[in-house]
């Protein structure tokens, strides 16, 4: 009986690993947008944290350089938070039913 349980567990682990790989591939194609300055600065990135585009409203180009740098950083951080939230949401379906400790983060 123990051998059958172990074989079942190994099969389940392999299926979960395959599902996680598929989900990670999908996350690379999902894009999120971070914004700051009421949408004057936008950063679009994949859920794998690859920045795709940065948009800066022309009205900001004549303004203070330090303020513009702060807005770009804030938009980037907003995009990172959205990418992390989307990744966790998508991966939660893959890890559902696994006895993971509270707060355990999968490596993705």
UniProtKB/Swiss-Prot annotation:
Q: Which GO terms describe its cellular component?
A: bacterial nucleoid; cytosol
Subcellular localization, as worded in the UniProt entry:
Cytoplasm, Nucleoid
Keyword Transport listed? The answer is no
**Where does it primarily localize?**
cytoplasm
Which keywords label this protein?
Cytoplasm, DNA-binding
Signal as a keyword? no
> Which molecular function terms from Gene Ontology are attached?
DNA binding
Q: Which residues form a coiled coil?
A: none
Q: Which family does it belong to?
A: Belongs to the YbaB/EbfC family.
Q: What does this protein do?
A: Binds to DNA and alters its conformation. May be involved in regulation of gene expression, nucleoid organization and DNA protection.
Query: Could you describe the subunit structure of this protein?
Result: Homodimer.
Name the chain's protein: Nucleoid-associated protein mma_2329
What is the species of this protein?
Janthinobacterium sp. (strain Marseille)
